[in-house]
Amino acid sequence: LASHIPLEKIETIYLDYHSRSSVMLTRVLAKKFWKINVKWTDATEGFESRIKENEAAVIIGDKALVAEKNFPYVYDLAEEWIKHTGLPFVFAAWVTNRNLGETFKNEFNSALKYGITHIDDMVKNTNFSYLPSHISAKDYLTRNIDYLLDDNKTKGLNLFLKLAGEIN
């Protein structure tokens, strides 16, 4: 969440259209933990450059890395979640409601393991020139993203789903 002012002074929050999980996390944080009541506005292309003094915006992905330098107040949503709950936040996961069979699970887990253990190769062979110069692609992919869904992350996910259900 990026803003020119502190949380308690924000009147409007623009919601990035690229991530429903980040949008809902922001709504949960605002209602349950930050205790702020704001106007929610769906963002449109280029919204990051139109944020006024009493506004904030959920900015995700690579755009968030750039936004860090343009706003005096930047709240990392995952860090805010951890600060208030003590649990990690799960932004995305592979899920299904049908049985895919052991063959698929084994192949998927093998591909995931291969990807995780070959991040160095991927970084060498991919153009990350769009990242700000102070961001290392390898660091971003190995420190900012955790690829395994463990019990603690499942607890965090379940708490998030419960709280999201309460505010909807």
Per-segment meaning from a language model:
Residues 1, 94-95, 131-135:
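Short hydrophobic/aromatic-rich motifs at helix boundaries and adjacent loops
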Residues 1-50, 54-55, 155:
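Bilobed "Venus flytrap"/periplasmic-binding protein-like clamshell domains
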Residues 5, 29, 78-81, 85, ...:
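Solvent-exposed, flexible loop/coil residues
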Residues 10, 89-91, 144:
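Short, solvent-exposed beta-strand edge segments and adjacent coil->beta transition regions
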Residues 14, 93, 146:
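Short aromatic/hydrophobic contact patches that present stacked aromatics
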Residues 42-126:
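Pocket-lining segment of extracytoplasmic ligand-binding domains
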Residues 92, 167-168:
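Short, basic/aromatic-enriched C-terminal tail that caps enzymatic domains
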Residues 100-167:
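Secondary-structure end/capping motifs
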